[in-house]
Structure formats: structure tokens, C-alpha cells
Amino acid sequence: MGNTDDVKAVKPEKLSSPPPPAAPDQSNSHVYPDWAAMQAYYGPRVALPPYFNPAVASGQSPHPYMWGPPQPVMPPYGVPYAALYAHGGVYAHPGVPLAASPMSMDTHAKSSGTNEHGLIKKLKGHDDLAMSIGNGKADSSEGEMERTLSQSKETEGSSDGSNENSKRAAVNGRKRGRDEAPNMIGEVKIETQSSVIPSPRAKSEKLLGITVATPMVAGKVVGTVVSPSMTSSLELKDSPKEHAVNSPAGGQQPSTMMPNDSWLHNDRDLKRERRKQSNRESARRSRLRKQAEAEELAIKVDSLTAENMALKAEINRLTLTAEKLTNDNSRLLEVMKNAQAERAADVGLGNNNEKKASTLSTANLLSRVDNAGSGDRDEGESDVYEKTTKSGAKLHQLLDANPRTDAVAAG
């Protein structure tokens, strides 16, 4: 029991000890030792802009080597170079002001570890509540200090049961660490859901010298938020100077944003409109092609119709000509028949007339012969008459005979 009383008496003395002095301010320290060479390069009459000191918070104008305006140096060819060195090559200055990333919305300004312990004690004296400053580093460091102090006092005060007390302290420390981890996670969750409107608690923290970054949600952030209980032991090992610089304006670094539903919807609408436009263009081209083919077919139909009409007219004309020729032929045939009939009739009349004339001549001849034999004749002439009558009979026989019968008789 004496050991525990000694521990309780020693704790406030150790924790209430004044913090060590802070690190000296390096805002006035000169960074570039070759300032004389730079003045010789630019000339004494050129007004040089103020340089950038990495120990000072961002917001001042950058160094002339990197981001200065073009100097009035006349190069032999071309325009002067805007920068002598590549960005981040020689002088590792930040291109944008350091700001709190929206991926870790509960990030606050961190001061040195000793100052944080003193501020935590002051805040506990005001409202008897432990505040989570930064990402839970102060609470975890306080618990570790208490555990180490209790272990040291127990080992110094007890000679026979030091091993048992140290084991019990280690078990208690592990239990306390397990109990503190959910509380720290809950505090982080509460801080991430804080609104943009500043609270009076934040004003009191600003008065005490603690700068709390206001969380602002710009959209869906890609990345995993690490809980403070996972990184508390690592952050205790880091140097406090790495977390001392914070953005005065509370700017945010650009983070990778996931495409919103509206962007995806707009992209789908754009693709749909492109497909519709291509379909309309193809339909218009096919319609124009079909229209051109229809016009060509209409022209062909018109030409063929005109040619058909011309052929029909020619056929009608030839038909009329053929009918006319047929009529002329029939008329000529009739004329020829009539002419042949008339000729045949004329030939028959001529033959009859000739026959009649021949019969008359023969009759006249016979009559003359008869008349000549009926005159006066004597006895001497009686013999001659008989002879002539015989010859006259033969002549009548010859004249009366038909030529056909003669031919038959001769044959």
C-alpha cells in the first residue's frame, strides 16, 4: 500500500512539470547562402521578389528561381526561359499550399508532444473532459506515460514482488489499451460527422492555441480512412516538425473523385444520342439510295413506255398499209380476171367470123361452078361436062369436110 501512495503522490509532480521550451523559430534563417551570386546574376537594379522559406507557413510569394516573372535579360536567340530549374528538382518547394486532405477529415494541427501534454492538463482542469486532439495521439501518449510511471514506482518500491507487480501492470496496460481503442474510434467518428458551422468548443480551442481544421466534404473520396488507434504508435515516433506546417486558409489538396451518377448518366445519354444519330444517318442514306433507285426506275419506265407507244403507232401504220395493199391486190386480181375473160371472148368471136367467111367463099365458088355447067353445050362438050361434074363433086367433098375429120382420117 505504501507503494501505491507514493505513486499517487509522484504522478501530479511529474505531469505538472513545466514543458521544455519549444523549438526555435527558423523563419528568419537564411536558406540560400549564394545570395551574392544571385544578386550578381540579376543585377543591382532589378527588384527581386521575396524568397520562399520552407520553415514559414505557405502564403508568401515563391522564390525567383522557380516562379519569378521573366527578367529583362536579352538572350541572343528566342525568348528567355521562365524557370531555371525543374519543379521540385533542386529546391523541393511545394507547388500548392499544404492543406488537409478530405480523405482524413479529422486531421488537426499538431504541436510538440510536451506542449500537447500541458494543454491536455489545462483542458481537463476546465471541463473535466478529455478532448481528442489531432488523431488521438495525446490520449495514447498520456496512457503510456501513466503506465511507465506506475511500473517504475512499483519496481523501485517493492523488492520481493517486483516481477508480479510488473506482470500485473502489463496486463492492466493491455486492458486499458483495449478499452481506449473503441473510445478513440468513437471520437474519430463523431469528429468526422461534425458540421461546417464552428462551435463554441472550437472557439475555446482556438483561444488556447489549438487550430482545428474544419472538415468539408466535396464528394465521394476514393481511399480507406485509417482509424487513429491503428496509427497512434507510429505517429508517436514521428518528428513533430513534420506536422507543424498547416494551411492558414484551410485549403484542400485535390483528391481523386469517383464519377458521379449524373456523369455516368450523361455518358450513357451521350452514347445513346450517338447511336441514334448514326442510325438516323444510315436510315437517311438508305432512304436517299432507294429514292435514287426509284427515280432511275421511273425514268426507265417512262422511256420504255414512250418506246412502246412508238412501236404501237408503227405497228398500226404497217397494219393499215398491209390492208391497203391487200385491197389493191384483190382489185388488181379482179381486173386481171375481167381482162382475161374479155380476151377469151374476143378470141372466140374472131374464130367464128373466120369460119363464116370461109363457108361463104366456098359456097360462092360452088355456085359459080354449078352455074358455069348449066349453059349451052354440045355433044363434044358433054364429055367434058361429065368430067367437070365429077371434079365438082370432089370439090364439094373437100370443101364440106372438117379439118379434124381429115386429120382423123389421115391418121
UniProtKB/Swiss-Prot annotation:
Region of interest: Leucine-zipper: 297-332
Pfam family, one: MFMR_assoc
Skewed-composition ranges (Polar residues): 148-164, 249-259
Domain of life: Eukaryota
InterPro entries: bZIP, bZIP_plant_GBF1, bZIP_sf, GBF-like, MFMR
Subcellular localization(s) per the UniProt record: Nucleus
Disordered: annotated span: 1-30, 130-197, 232-293, 346-411
Record region (Basic motif): 271-290
Domain bZIP residues, every copy: 269-332
Positions with biased composition (Basic and acidic residues): 1-14, 235-244, 264-293
Factors inducing expression: By light.
Keywords, sorted A to Z: DNA-binding, Nucleus, Transcription, Transcription regulation
Gene Ontology CC annotations of this record: nucleus
GO molecular function terms attached to this record: DNA-binding transcription factor activity; transcription cis-regulatory region binding
Free-text function comment from the UniProt entry: Binds to the G-box-like motif (5'-ACGTGGC-3') of the chalcone synthase (CHS) gene promoter. G-box and G-box-like motifs are defined in promoters of certain plant genes which are regulated by such diverse stimuli as light-induction or hormone control.
Subunit structure, interactors included: Binds DNA as a dimer.
Family: Belongs to the bZIP family.
Name the UniProt record assigns to this protein: Common plant regulatory factor 1
